[in-house]
Amino acid sequence: MGDMANNSVAYSGVKNSLKEANHDGDFGITLAELRALMELRSTDALRKIQESYGDVYGICTKLKTSPNEGLSGNPADLERREAVFGKNFIPPKKPKTFLQLVWEALQDVTLIILEIAAIVSLGLSFYQPPEGDNALCGEVSVGEEEGEGETGWIEGAAILLSVVCVVLVTAFNDWSKEKQFRGLQSRIEQEQKFTVIRGGQVIQIPVADITVGDIAQVKYGDLLPADGILIQGNDLKIDESSLTGESDHVKKSLDKDPLLLSGTHVMEGSGRMVVTAVGVNSQTGIIFTLLGAGGEEEEKKDEKKKEKKNKKQDGAIENRNKAKAQDGAAMEMQPLKSEEGGDGDEKDKKKANLPKKEKSVLQGKLTKLAVQIGKAGLLMSAITVIILVLYFVIDTFWVQKRPWLAECTPIYIQYFVKFFIIGVTVLVVAVPEGLPLAVTISLAYSVKKMMKDNNLVRHLDACETMGNATAICSDKTGTLTMNRMTVVQAYINEKHYKKVPEPEAIPPNILSYLVTGISVNCAYTSKILPPEKEGGLPRHVGNKTECALLGFLLDLKRDYQDVRNEIPEEALYKVYTFNSVRKSMSTVLKNSDGSFRIFSKGASEIILKKCFKILSANGEAKVFRPRDRDDIVKTVIEPMASEGLRTICLAFRDFPAGEPEPEWDNENDVVTGLTCIAVVGIEDPVRPEVPEAIKKCQRAGITVRMVTGDNINTARAIATKCGILHPGEDFLCLEGKDFNRRIRNEKGEIEQERIDKIWPKLRVLARSSPTDKHTLVKGIIDSTVSEQRQVVAVTGDGTNDGPALKKADVGFAMGIAGTDVAKEASDIILTDDNFTSIVKAVMWGRNVYDSISKFLQFQLTVNVVAVIVAFTGACITQDSPLKAVQMLWVNLIMDTLASLALATEPPTESLLLRKPYGRNKPLISRTMMKNILGHAFYQLVVVFTLLFAGEKFFDIDSGRNAPLHAPPSEHYTIVFNTFVLMQLFNEINARKIHGERNVFEGIFNNAIFCTIVLGTFVVQIIIVQFGGKPFSCSELSIEQWLWSIFLGMGTLLWGQLISTIPTSRLKFLKEAGHGTQKEEIPEEELAEDVEEIDHAERELRRGQILWFRGLNRIQTQIRVVNAFRSSLYEGLEKPESRSSIHNFMTHPEFRIEDSEPLIPLIDDTDAEDDAPTKRNSSPPPSPNKNNNAVDSGIHLTIEMNKSATSSSPGSPLHSLETSL
């Protein structure tokens, strides 16, 4: 009975302990004793408490705290406790220094190759062959004027200097983003609060301020912030799997197992505990420190302690370590604010055991694209070097028949080094260094801005995944409605009151039952407080439905607090707390005569079925038959529900003193044979902005579904008010039990085919359990009923919503009403619990994708042109027209700036005027491909014209076939300058990727873009006019500058011409991808595929969607590339482990599998809107079409599970993980 009989106790000596604590720093129990006690489990712990301290109140006395009043809150006392018992904080690892980040940036293989080549070039440039031998070395050394040989070192030095610049820029980016992340992290941590009792007042304090001796209130959904011992509990069940590996919920009670451990989840019930260990001394903290999260000193110190403990309590530690290996969730202690945690092994275990996302949509596609670009670049650079070396060797030793002289060897080697540098230049050009940075910047920028739109992003990839969302499964309460509940109708003493009745109209005994039942059978943490501002609304604290009932008592001019003062929470004999399965709450009171009375409240149809009597008009109980119940349902409950009211039934039952005491653990026998007191109708108004937000979603091709625990009539009424349902539409509204009946076969197994028949038309799922929600979400995601497979976002607030939130592509948790467990399972937290914030998330998600596409269009144009120019130029003229240092400026510096410029475009409402991208849409739409090839054609024509005819046009010396270490030529400077200016003006073109004509639209709204374009132009002037030998530049005249600018601006005019050409006419673009039928794609690749987005298309045909299909079949090639890419980025920082769920902005992680997902990179479908006017206009106004998932324009052929994948430092987006 001890777990039920939470009766008041005379706390001898405890009440005075508050005063003692302020004067005496010596506690009656040491830190070591508390740690040893918390190591024990269940009966061992209970025995130790009884033997050493008597009971939990004895521990409270020794800790100088009151079980009822808590700590005094005196600052001196709190400081003393922190000094003795520690702070609720795990010191994070020191952030990497700037020099460490510089060293890591230097590990890039491309840069290492350039460094080696530059050093060799530098060393050889100082060698001069004997004068007499110069002629014998052939033409290779002819043409060097006096003194020019001495400047040969400049090129090598300039390359080294460029590498230093690149490294510093990279390191600074990483450093600033890590700093930004830590700032955001600390801000999030400051917002984490927990409820404690101090000075007799229930207050919320930051988790870090909790100290030993605090009396903490725990409730359903909490993640425990510290270790403690239960003082009083109501039906308390804890999920300890994070520490023990046991999946069953553990029932906690004073007489069986009173220990509560940090990092565990409260799955049911409520209670109070005295905090006994915090921070590194708590059970989760000990594990953190053993893993090194607390720093090296802590680790060494705790390793010694661990060894000692192993001898004494080997079993306990072994058990915990085994549990840790089984379930990495031990690392998820929310309140312990470790920003980095765990060594690599534990991190890998955690990832292996905690299902989270695979590669996100964008990451998957960019990974594949980077692999293919890397392959092409490697091939082109190798061919370039081979051709140059062969040409030189054949020309020198075969055609000119020169002998190989030992004295000439250094000169020959210089040539080979020069060829090698040209080859590396081609590789540098081909590898899109700016791409990971563009993703990082775009996501970081979006995440920062989304916080202002009430979206707190925990997983960065969720930000862009929202751009793909085709379906949103939303809760009703608080998300679509205001969560400001009030009782507006009631059925009492056989009368249906359309407004709250006067207390005089209710018989006194019914009023008494009503007041006592509501006061004690609502959580004592639910209360109504006076308004913060004069004239404002009273504040509702705790469960909003219970607050509505308490407000109902206040409307009846009765004060619930008087009843609670008379019957404190400790006097409650037994509480059956509310959960999603029972959908009711019951409280048992023991009367002085030995009799019991139970009060119940819950969903009206559930409680009414358990009622055998009802209080009549005169206040007497009369028999309540099934037909009477049916009458009430038809005349009272259904009319209330059809007005959108939530109906709650209140009832009671007496257990006379003479009868045997019931078996309290058998709830079904206890909560039955009730007497109905009243049925109340609670109004929760729809948020005024929600109907418009839902209309925007439907216009954007997103289907909104309501999943709620309310009855079907209430749900249907609210759905109609919101605009989810429209009169006359053929859509389904189902209750959970009906839904389950339809989707299961005779054996009770769920069948996907059955779900597929329901979900396309389903709009409302009422009376649903969290399991139903998970089943629906999984069913929609896994469905292949149409090619347009779904990307699903889900909102959730309850502990049991965790599975659905994790299964969804994007899980939204409620910041206000959500439990810690729901927040932990989510990807994004809605800080205002408002549906309109989800719409903003969709807008930001689409904007991220657009930003990356813009940069991709710009980057690929630069890459195509530069690779062809470097390759062709090198093969024809024996030298690259664009020198290594110039290419470093173009590719590493300018692209970095361009990624910043294009990735920070603010979103516009027009993003919501088109359908979602979908999972399998190609990354490069045909419009983008048209722009890339069109602009590349213009730029190549200009560059090659200047290269082979420029000297005649400008009447200057030709720069072609210049000897080694020749001075910079005006000719090649004009080529370089024109090339850069064409990229600069093409950056403006790249702002639009849908074929819009006005590329300047909104340009001044983006100050970053304007600043960067102007800044790049200024730097280009400095490089050309003053760069000299290091940049291989010669000063240009005003005329030459004007011609360069004119040719650069030509890209804007050329862009208008390209926009005029209808994409649908360019059939040859189709040849870029070979059609692969759906059935040809191997199942395992289907399972790994990820979402695709393309802006240019409305639909995607089944065939002809895959590019480089052959590459996917050659597994060994991909392994080679993986190895190459791993080495390419091996020096980059490993991502911080998600050791604490405080790390809300944890990093997106992915790896490149041997079996690459089949993702089309080039779109080759015909359906395309070429005119910007079409593209920006809203789709056809058919509500069915807008609101039907089948027409949402998504083509999906794969499953994307939210499961963790280990991070690969070789991934091209790895910088994303390391820098945020």
From Swiss-Prot:
One of its GO terms (biological process) is cellular response to vitamin D. CDD domains: P-type_ATPase_Ca_PMCA-like (cd02081). Residues 1100-1117 are annotated as: Calmodulin-binding subdomain A. It is found in: Cell membrane; Basolateral cell membrane; Synapse; Presynaptic cell membrane. Keywords: Acetylation, ATP-binding, Calcium, Calcium transport, Calmodulin-binding, Cell membrane, Cell projection, Cytoplasmic vesicle, Ion transport, Magnesium, Membrane, Metal-binding, Nucleotide-binding, Phosphoprotein, Synapse, Translocase, Transmembrane, Transmembrane helix, Transport. Its EC number is 7.2.2.10. Residues 1200-1220 have a biased composition (Polar residues). The modification Phosphothreonine is found at residues 1116, 1165. Mg(2+) binds at residues 475, 477, 797. It catalyses: Ca(2+)(in) + ATP + H2O = Ca(2+)(out) + ADP + phosphate + H(+). One of its GO terms (cellular component) is apical plasma membrane. Residues 297-356, 1162-1220 are annotated as: Disordered. Isoform B is ubiquitously expressed. Isoforms A and E have only been found in brain cortex. Isoform C is found in brain cortex, skeletal muscle and heart muscle. Isoform D has only been found in fetal skeletal muscle. Isoform K has been found in small intestine and liver. Isoform B is expressed in hair cells of inner ear. The active site is at 475 (4-aspartylphosphate intermediate). Residues 2-105, 176-366, 440-855, 904-927, 992-1005, 1061-1220 are cytoplasmic. The modification Phosphoserine is found at residues 8, 17, 338, 1140, 1155, 1177-1178, 1182. Residues 312-325, 337-356 have a biased composition (Basic and acidic residues). GO terms for molecular function: ATP binding; ATP hydrolysis activity; calcium ion transmembrane transporter activity; calmodulin binding; metal ion binding; P-type calcium transporter activity; PDZ domain binding. Belongs to the cation transport ATPase (P-type) (TC 3.A.3) family. Type IIB subfamily. PANTHER family: CATION TRANSPORTING ATPASE (PTHR24093), PLASMA MEMBRANE CALCIUM-TRANSPORTING ATPASE 1 (PTHR24093:SF245). Isoforms A, C, D and E contain and additional calmodulin-binding subdomain B which is different in the different splice variants and shows pH dependent calmodulin binding properties. Catalyzes the hydrolysis of ATP coupled with the transport of calcium from the cytoplasm to the extracellular space thereby maintaining intracellular calcium homeostasis. Plays a role in blood pressure regulation through regulation of intracellular calcium concentration and nitric oxide production leading to regulation of vascular smooth muscle cells vasoconstriction. Positively regulates bone mineralization through absorption of calcium from the intestine. Monomer. Dimer. Oligomer. Calmodulin binding. Interacts with PDZD11. Interacts with SLC35G1 and STIM1. Interacts with YWHAE; interacts with the monomeric and dimeric forms of the YWHAE but prefer the monomer form; this interaction inhibits calcium-transporting ATPase activity. Interacts with NPTN; this interaction stabilizes ATP2B1 and increases ATPase activity; this interaction controls T cell calcium homeostasis following T cell activation. Interacts with EPB41; regulates small intestinal calcium absorption through regulation of membrane expression of ATP2B1. This is Plasma membrane calcium-transporting ATPase 1. It comes from Rattus norvegicus. The lineage of its organism: Eukaryota, Metazoa, Chordata, Craniata, Vertebrata. The gene is Atp2b1.
